[in-house]
Amino acid sequence: EWLTCPVGMIWDNKQCSGSAIKLKFDEVDQAILKANEQLKGKWRLPKRHELEKLVCMECDKAKIETSIFPNTPPESFWTSEINQWQPRFMWTVNFFTGHTFGRFPGYIPNYVRLVRDR
């Protein structure tokens, strides 16, 4: 189950409002704790293949179904995976290009979309 809004935004039964926030990788755990507390459940960062499944190459501005995930910034989102070829870098999925990149060190902030197992 996906969180409809990126971290920092709030679902108001019609759309995501507010501003999505970029987090450094070491700040993500705190956001997950807050989500678990406020929204109940066991939220987590998605694996690379999970986040890649949200990419919609036919979609316009943001490469994601905005009817399901409204107001998604067309930028990079963290996955939970380290780039095994370059262990200082994490994998991200870019919703502007629809591509996956393993070139972001954890100190560069990126957006976060959380998921939980049913």
Where are these regions (language model features)?
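An exposed tryptophan-centered "aromatic clamp" motif
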Residues: 27-44, 48-97, 103, 117
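Extracellular adhesion/carbohydrate-recognition regions
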Residues: 1-43, 114-115
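Extracellular, disulfide-bonded carbohydrate-recognition/adhesion ectodomains
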Residues: 19-25, 98-113
